[in-house]
Regions:
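Positively charged, low-complexity terminal tracts
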Residues: 1-120
Length: 120
């Protein structure tokens, strides 16, 4: 089955690193995470869940672990269709991407508050 996209949606860059990018789509009210070879669509709630699950991974403990366990983590988020199987380096890169994204969102919120406060 071939589907044709009839409407064009514009994605706004929120934050980019060499490992990936996060975009915001106002028309669809969602976020696109371009990371680890795939582009995944998240609503804001699921993006927060992704951030929480990545932040809870103890990278230092995993690096200091001397057992023969594989150095990968499976990140699965309830109520989302996406799953990531990532190495420790990829987890660090995803954490950096998510941290930068939420810093940019907070900065945008602060600027919006200040500019709207000046205008009124």
């Amino acid at each position: 089955m071939i589907t044709t996209i009839t409407t064009t949606t514009s994605w706004t860059d929120v934050f980019k690193t060499s490992a990936g990018a996060i975009y915001q789509c106002d028309a669809e009210r969602c976020w696109y995470v371009d990371f680890a070879g795939k582009v995944a669509k998240f609503d804001y709630r699921c993006l927060l869940k992704l951030r929480k699950s990545v932040y809870h991974i103890d990278i230092e403990q995993a690096l200091l672990n001397t057992t023969k366990d594989p150095d990968v983590e499976i990140i699965f988020i309830c109520a989302c269709d996406h799953c990531y199987v990532l190495s420790l380096l990829q987890i660090i890169a995803l954490k950096e991407l998510l941290e930068g994204t939420f810093v940019m969102l907070e900065l945008n919120h602060i600027l919006h508050e200040r500019l709207c406060g000046i205008a009124s």
